[in-house]
Design a protein with these regions (language model features):
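Conserved acetyl-CoA-binding loop-helix of GNAT-fold acetyltransferases
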Residues: 69-80
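Acidic/polar active-site rim loop that often engages polyanionic ligands
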Residues: 114-121, 138-145
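Glycine-rich phosphate-binding "P-loop"
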Residues: 60-69
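Short glycine-/small-residue-rich flexible loop motifs, especially phosphate/cofactor-binding loops
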Residues: 79, 99, 137
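"Short basic amphipathic alpha-helical interaction patches in structured regions
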Residues: 73-75, 130-132, 136
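A conserved beta-strand-loop-helix scaffold within acyl/acetyltransferase catalytic domains
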Residues: 5-56, 63, 87, 91-109, ...
């Protein structure tokens, strides 16, 4: 038995992905395409919000996405949508624009992380603070480890089996479940739109 909002209705996931692909989103927006999310579509504008309901709490996965995601009315309308169903909305990992809208509604906020964006054209490993990164890079080079961009469909059967084995071993060694809600798992790697970077040693 599924609780309200615990899973998307047929077609909602495809519709949400189309909204996302038309443009407009944050660092977590692609995660909204994963299974297990429900979707709310803003009336009259091109925006949507992915969420999951636990008890009477509706937790969003990031903020709104879509071309009209920055419209202040989107967050307000989602709050009203939740209120009509007796849910308390919680906006998880939203940007400053969306936070400002919620501030106007008298909401409080708690910082859970910081987002770092690196420009590959200007980033450098130079400097004392990045000594550990240089050490790891040099060691990998000595041991013949190289990085390779690929997709799940391009991997060989052997590579796929090894990745599954690594994933299962990681889960078996932990006392907590795989954190699919924010980090994803093997299932999410199989999406054709997802690029993978794998590290190969000198023997492969």
């Amino acid at each position: 038995v599924l609780s309200p909002g615990s899973a998307a209705h047929a077609g909602d996931r495809a519709r949400a992905r189309a909204v996302l692909e038309r443009g407009g989103g944050g660092a977590l927006s692609f995660m909204t395409t994963w299974t297990g999310n429900a979707y709310w579509f803003a009336p009259g504008v091109d925006a949507a919000i992915a969420y999951r309901v636990r008890g009477r709490i509706a937790v969003t996965l990031g903020g709104a996405f879509g071309r009209d995601r920055t419209d202040p009315g989107v967050a307000r309308a989602f709050v009203d949508f939740c209120g009509e169903r007796g849910w308390t909305p919680v906006f998880y990992s939203v940007d400053d624009v969306e936070s400002a809208t919620l501030d106007e509604l008298g909401w409080s906020r708690t910082q859970v992380a910081e987002e770092a964006r690196l420009d590959p054209a200007t980033w450098t490993p130079a400097g004392k603070k990045r000594q550990d990164e240089r050490t790891a890079t040099h060691r990998a080079a000595r041991e013949g480890v190289r990085a390779e961009w690929t997709t799940w469909s391009e991997l060989s059967f052997r590579d796929r089996a090894q990745i599954r084995e690594i994933s299962e071993a990681w889960v078996a060694d932990k006392t907590i479940p795989e954190m699919e809600f924010t980090l994803g798992g093997v299932e999410q790697m199989t999406d054709p739109a997802v690029r993978l970077m794998i590290a190969r040693d000198g023997q492969h």
